Amino acid sequence: MRPVMSRLGCATLAAAGVLLVLAPAALGQQPVSRLKGRVVSERGEPLKDADVRAEAFFGAAAGTFAGQRTFSTKTNAKGDWSILGIAPGIWLFEAVAPEHIPEIVALPIRLLTPSGPNAGGQVLIWELVLKPVRPPEDPRGRMLMDATTAARAGKSDEVRAVLRQVPEDADAEYLAAAGRIALVAREAGLARPLFMRALERDPASYRAAMGIASLFLLQRDFDSASRAFDATRNRTHDKDEQKWLSAAIGDLATIKVR
């Protein structure tokens, strides 16, 4: 398993001073849920045999995670996928399809779900629809695919070497794609400036906003993450994306910060 965000060095600093007002039963044995979703192209076409991976970074109430931390599956002919075993916490989901740039997002999953010996899991009422995109058919696009291959192989040094060559004149989509690849490699320090540059190029960039929201969440900066997820939701007209983004915003609303 790849290092659990060893390069998110600022995570604990971002969470310092945050007081979580926990639900009475937030501790103890946590129920698991089934999360369903789809992987489709930008045009909505199902992507068969895409790899879907889920990794937990924090547990209930954004504390220490206990249990099975990673899951992986593949999509069927309709692009559908399903994972049983998602416990309350903060999870990073990624979808990788052949010849596509990975789609990746961190989400809160029932952070303050009541627990106990009779607590049972259930199917989450929203589906996580992820949309990997094709890279440009030119040397720049091949550079992104090389970085993707290295990221999936856990070769962080190669990822850093490739992504540091991102052209200065790259557009927002290209920069956001590079940021997602950096996040797949768990190189948060490299992903952040790429997402920020993407937003500077295009303040309406959906994927750049989603990348920033994910980074805030992985740092447990819940207030900033909530605002960033709201900004992300405002940048898409896709009803499925709006639904799971609304679920994330609602989940973060259960955490009160003093």
Name each model-derived stretch.
Residues G37-K48, T149-R152:
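Structural motif
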Residues A60-D80:
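Short, acidic Ser/Thr/Gly-rich low-complexity loop/linker segments typical of extracellular
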Residues I90, E94-I109:
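A short, solvent-exposed loop/turn motif at the edges and junctions
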Residues G141, E173, R207, E241-W244:
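Start-of-helix register in tetratricopeptide repeats
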Residues R152, V184, L218, D251-R258:
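Register position in tetratricopeptide repeats
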Residues D169-D171, P203, H237:
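Short coil turns that delineate tetratricopeptide repeat
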